[in-house]
Amino acid sequence: MPTRITNFLHDSLQTGVQVLGTSFNTADVHVHDLTATLPDFQRTGRNFYGIVEGIHVRLTSAGSPTKVTIRVCADADGDYTLVPDTEATLVAGVTTATSKCAAFSVGIPIFQILGGPGNGSLYLFAKVDDGTGNPVLAQSCITWRE
């Protein structure tokens, strides 16, 4: 009889008021502590190890941009890239054209060993193709499994 494998799904939701431009900036980052939902004995000072399944972002005041690019790093300076630059088309809301969302399918295992701080946090950077109107990175969500 085959062994049954159980996956545990987790998510990390962050909100913010970061105004995005057309280049990455260390001030425009969402910090996701992916160990926050783990039991205390598993998360204290632990490197993150899991499979990032997907990333969702929501922008507000986003009348002009049509595309968003994300990068996920192991450090706040953006020097240890775990998920390289990935672009997606923004989809406008049905009733609010300046509220736009994008979804990214990642599906890669990540083990935070590349010299980052090893604190279980991943740093989500974002930029847009047109910064007119000061689009805001209002929410981001990283879904992962162990």
Kindly give the residue locations of the regions a language model identified.
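C-terminal interaction-tip segments
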Residues: 1-24, 119-120, 127-146
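Solvent-exposed serine/threonine-rich low-complexity stretches and specific carbohydrate-binding patches
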Residues: 10-15, 83-96
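Short, surface-exposed linear segments at secondary-structure transitions and domain or protein termini
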Residues: 16-17, 92-103, 146
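Ser/Thr- and Asn-enriched, surface-exposed coil loops between beta-strands
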Residues: 22, 26-28, 95-98
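Beta-rich globular "head" domains
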Residues: 30-73, 143
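Residues within well-ordered beta-strands of beta-sheet-rich folds
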Residues: 56, 107, 123-127
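Beta-sandwich interaction modules
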Residues: 97-121
